[in-house]
């Protein structure tokens, strides 16, 4: 953790208590119990909120850095706003400061019995490490729901870009997508297939014992939502296209593994 980055975030958010949740290559994520409009009389009750902060990059020219930070923050907020409008499970945007690379959003999730945040990955790990039945109906149902959620995302030609089990949180027994820093829009089956393959590989590497079952249930959920009436024949056509591309992407992945 780089202290000066946290200090910079605090300068951008004076008088706001910040607790670091995670740090990635592009951003820091904080927890706070203060609403950005806390001075409003109707918002005096404190809640839980998440703040994502994109720090400046010292290796970039200041003007270029400022432009990139603003552009990426605006892009992520717009993407999340569209998800909210489409009722695709994702955090609700509360506020944003584009110039400083700050996104303020609702807090999603809960603490598992071991204290870990309720990401899809942590939830599966908790079950596995505590000798729970990882092939139970409840696990199958959750994997199925995750697959449906991703399918709905893709049917609206939206690509996550970093689809791992860490970027899916569980909230009231429903999966919620988070972290859209690499998200994009695309109607290409190839891009949807890569999204699926990234998650498939993440599941295989972090949950190897039950990966076959998890991935099978995920794909069943993904297929199911494509067959819903609201998407008509176009949904089924897109499903055929993406499954064919997924086989191609898997083959390329295996070849890369063989070649090292």
Curated annotation (Swiss-Prot):
Localization in the cell: Cytoplasm; Nucleus; Chromosome, Telomere
Residues that bind ATP: 21-29, 52
Top-level lineage group: Eukaryota
E.C. no: 3.6.-.-, 2.7.11.1
Domain Protein kinase stretches: 15-260
Active site, per annotation: 162
Gene3D superfamilies: Phosphorylase Kinase, domain 1, Transferase(Phosphotransferase) domain 1
A GO-annotated cellular component: EKC/KEOPS complex
Keywords: Activator, ATP-binding, Chromosome, Cytoplasm, Hydrolase, Kinase, Nucleotide-binding, Nucleus, Phosphoprotein, Serine/threonine-protein kinase, Telomere, Transcription, Transcription regulation, Transferase, tRNA processing
InterPro entries: Bud32, Kinase-like_dom_sf, Prot_kinase_dom, RIO_dom, Tyr_kinase_AS
Catalytic activity: L-seryl-[protein] + ATP = O-phospho-L-seryl-[protein] + ADP + H(+); L-threonyl-[protein] + ATP = O-phospho-L-threonyl-[protein] + ADP + H(+)
PANTHER family (UniProt xref): EKC_KEOPS COMPLEX SUBUNIT TP53RK (PTHR12209:SF0), NON-SPECIFIC SERINE/THREONINE PROTEIN KINASE (PTHR12209)
Subunit structure of this chain's protein: Component of the EKC/KEOPS complex composed of at least BUD32, CGI121, GON7, KAE1 and PCC1; the whole complex dimerizes.
Function: Component of the EKC/KEOPS complex that is required for the formation of a threonylcarbamoyl group on adenosine at position 37 (t(6)A37) in tRNAs that read codons beginning with adenine. The complex is probably involved in the transfer of the threonylcarbamoyl moiety of threonylcarbamoyl-AMP (TC-AMP) to the N6 group of A37. BUD32 has ATPase activity in the context of the EKC/KEOPS complex and likely plays a supporting role to the catalytic subunit KAE1. The EKC/KEOPS complex also promotes both telomere uncapping and telomere elongation.
Protein family (similarity comment): Belongs to the protein kinase superfamily. BUD32 family.
Annotated protein name in UniProt: EKC/KEOPS complex subunit BUD32
């Amino acid at each position: 953790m780089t202290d000066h980055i946290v200090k910079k975030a605090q300068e951008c958010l004076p008088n706001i208590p910040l607790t670091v949740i995670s740090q990635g290559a592009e951003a820091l994520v904080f927890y706070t119990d203060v609403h950005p409009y806390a001075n409003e009389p109707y918002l005096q009750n404190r809640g839980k909120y998440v703040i994502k902060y994109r720090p400046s990059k010292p290796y970039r020219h200041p003007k270029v850095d400022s432009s990139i930070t603003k552009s990426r923050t605006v892009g992520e907020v717009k993407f999340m706003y569209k998800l909210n409008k489409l009722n695709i499970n994702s955090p609700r945007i509360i506020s944003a400061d584009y110039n400083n690379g700050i996104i303020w959003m609702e807090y999603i999730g809960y603490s598992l019995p071991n204290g870990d945040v309720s990401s899809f990955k942590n939830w599966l790990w908790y079950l596995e490490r505590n000798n729970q039945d990882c092939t139970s109906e409840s696990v199958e149902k959750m994997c199925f729901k995750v697959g449906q959620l991703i399918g709905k995302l893709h049917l609206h030609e939206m690509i996550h870009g970093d689809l791992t089990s860490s970027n899916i949180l569980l909230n009231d027994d429903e999966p919620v997508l988070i972290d859209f820093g690499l998200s994009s829009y695309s109607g290409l089956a190839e891009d949807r297939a890569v999204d699926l393959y990234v998650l498939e590989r993440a599941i295989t590497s972090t949950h190897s014992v039950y990966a076959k079952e998890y991935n099978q249930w995920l794909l069943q959920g993904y297929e199911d939502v494509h067959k819903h009436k609201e998407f008509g024949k176009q949904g089924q056509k897109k499903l055929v296209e993406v499954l064919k591309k997924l086989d191609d992407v898997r083959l390329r992945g295996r070849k890369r593994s063989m070649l090292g």
